[in-house]
Amino acid sequence: MNVEIITIGDELLIGQVVDTNSAWMAKELNDCGFRVKQITSISDDRQHIINALTEAQGRADVILITGGLGPTRDDITKTTLCEYFKTELIQNKKVLKDIESMFKSFGSEMIETNWQQADVPSNCKVITNSKVTP
């Protein structure tokens, strides 16, 4: 089975952050018998995300996306994915509760963009992350 990994984030392209996610994913996938055919890095740009998904669909059986989900006002990844897959964002109550618990454990207040982290595509399966960072 052929896999493509798409990494999203301007910070990756300008060298501000080193992409260790795709390297880790590729190794784990390879260890499980999957073949990563391509790793594509793109900016936080609606059209770049759509183009990367369209192109990857022609090459890969499985497409994995990492990045582009930071709690920033300019994040467009989720809305672009919803547009591409013809669905909408909904607030996931379990995810929101987990986010609230995390902030409480760190003694921090949530801001508007943190609430938006609980918004997920209505047709997705949420995979929770127990290893959170402040």
What is each stretch, according to the model?
Residues 38-48:
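Short beta->alpha junction loops
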Residues 60:
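An anion/phosphate-binding loop that grips the pyrophosphate of nucleotide cofactors and donors
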Residues 48, 76-134:
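Proline/glycine-rich low-complexity loops and linkers
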Residues 1-39:
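Glycine-rich phosphate/diphosphate-binding loop of Rossmann-like nucleotide-binding domains
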Residues 10-11, 68-71:
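Short glycine-rich anion-binding loops that position phosphate/pyrophosphate groups of nucleotides
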